[in-house]
Amino acid sequence: MTVRLRLAVTAAAAVVMTGCATETPDYQSVWSTTTAPPTTTTDASTPPKSIAAFLEESGVGGQPVAPDKLTDLTVSIPTPAGWQPYMNTNLAPGTRTIAKGDTYPMAMLMVFELDGDFDVTQALSHANADAQMSENFRELNTSAEPFNGFPSSMIEGSYDLNGSRMHSYNRIVIATGAPPKAQRYLIQFTVTGYADKAAEEAPDIETIIKGFTVKLP
């Protein structure tokens, strides 16, 4: 059964909001669910379109896949000492989530097997929209450079969430698996924590970000 990308992202976001954050941005929390008000857009009447919305409008479906179940693509993140798997039934099936303690800092990895044709460049032009619509979002860094040879978009920033200032990192990669199938995947990797603990948590966060892997087997 194909899961609509928007709904899967919403579920993950809701989990982050209710109890899961870091020094590098997690735009799962930014997508703090269904309809976060576009507080940082220049025209509130026309908020930016998310990548999930773009893909849905293009007729593209997405089926969640556990990263460790992939056979035509290697997708993984490391687990620093003191971090452990974070389980929540609201997360999309197959989501890999690790946290230090009961909530933040947290890292989340989701993979969607895509069904349908679309313009990758156009899709990635919408990759940062959800982050930019978070409350009082302040951009710190962005990149549209490929990641390990795959089309990608990255954004870092800080934003307000439930009375706390968060610092988050989000990267979306659109990768094509090994032949002969050459399946296309959307990979979303996010890391989030409290902004006031950014320096303290930086070593672990940097380890996770640097260890994020997307490659052909």
Where are these regions (language model features)?
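N-terminal targeting sequences that direct proteins away from the cytosol to non-cytosolic compartments
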Residues: T2-G94, K181, T192-P217
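Short acidic-hydrophobic surface loop/beta-edge motif
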Residues: G61-T71, R96-K100, S143-P146, G157-Y159
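Extracytoplasmic
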Residues: L70-T74, D102-M106, F150-S152
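A short acidic-to-branched-hydrophobic micro-motif
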Residues: R96-Q122, Y169
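Solvent-exposed loop/turn segments at secondary-structure junctions
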Residues: L114-G116, Y159-N162, G193-K197
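Extracytoplasmic/secreted proteins, especially bacterial periplasmic and envelope-associated proteins
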Residues: Q122, H126, D204-T207
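Signature of long, low-cysteine stretches enriched in small and polar/charged residues
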Residues: N128-P180
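Short hydrophobic/glycine-rich mini-motifs in sensory/regulatory modules
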Residues: P180-I187
